[in-house]
Every structure is written in C-alpha cells, then in structure tokens.
Amino acid sequence: MYMLNESTKEILKKPFGKVYKELPPINRKVNIIAVGDITTKNLLSKSIIPNLSIIDLKTKRNIPVKINHKFKTVFEVNNPQGCISDEAEETIKYISSLDMVDTALIVKDGEEDLLTMMVIRYFPKDTIVLYGQPDEGVVLLTINQDLKHKINNILSMMDKI
C-alpha cells in the first residue's frame, strides 16, 4: 500500500494537466478514463461513456452523488483515504489488461482521488484521463511516457507499507 506523506501531498496539489472550467471536446477514438463522480456524471450527461469510471459515490469526501447509469461491469475495492491500496492497484492493473467499455470501479470504503496515478501507470499511452480539480474544474491529460515517468517518481517518494 502506498501512503501520502508531506512531500507527496505538496506535489499532488498541482494538477497533472490543463484545468478546464467546462468539459473540453474529447477524442472518442481512444480509451477514456474518468476519475471522480462529478467528472463521470458530466461525461455521461454528454453521452460520453468512459472505458473506466473510478467513483466513490460522493464528492468532497461526504456529499452523496447519484449516478443514473447502469455500468456493464462493476468492480468494488477498498481504498483508504490518503492511500493507494494493493487491492485497488491490482484491480486497475487487471482492468487495464482487458478491452473493456462502460466499466466502473467503485471505492466502497475510502476515496478514489489517488487512483489517477495507477491509471497513468497501467493504462497505455494515448489514453485520455479526466479527473476533477476541486473548485477549479476538470483536468484532462493524455498518458505519455513523460507522465508515466513522473508518476513513477512520485510513487517512489510515497511511504510504502
């Protein structure tokens, strides 16, 4: 399990990509991963069905979010706040090896925020990842080798228990 520490908390406050106030146009010909309930809900409202949605059914840690969508495949994991559990990492790694569409990974205990790093680590280059930047908008990034390298550096700085 990876755990945040003071140095990685500071690094992770900055978005990994450009922050948009509104959902930007998205290339639908590549894998699309949504991390966060509001991001997922916004994509679905525009009839964009992500290959994978990572959600915990709440926003800002405790406000419930209802997503009116029946995902084709659902996985559930525990992922404590401020951590990346081994269970969550292995599940994302497994999902990345499949050719899945309309899949949900529901974090039933904890939060999903840090799982963006596992998506970047395990999904192929050119995958589009969207995640919410609280009170700012949505971050859109495209996985590339530089981003994978940056994420691996951050993960190496986190506490491993």
From Swiss-Prot:
Protein name in the entry: GTP-dependent dephospho-CoA kinase
EC number(s) per entry: 2.7.1.237
Pfam family, one: DUF359
Protein family (similarity comment): Belongs to the GTP-dependent DPCK family.
InterPro entries assigned to the protein according to its UniProt record, in alphabetical order: GTP-dep_dephospho-CoA_kin
GO BP field: coenzyme A biosynthetic process
Source organism phylogeny: Archaea, Methanobacteriati, Methanobacteriota, Methanomada group, Methanococci
EC top class named in words: transferase
Catalytic reaction(s) noted: 3'-dephospho-CoA + GTP = GDP + CoA + H(+)
Alphabetized UniProt keyword annotations: Coenzyme A biosynthesis, GTP-binding, Kinase, Nucleotide-binding, Transferase
Function statement: Catalyzes the GTP-dependent phosphorylation of the 3'-hydroxyl group of dephosphocoenzyme A to form coenzyme A (CoA).
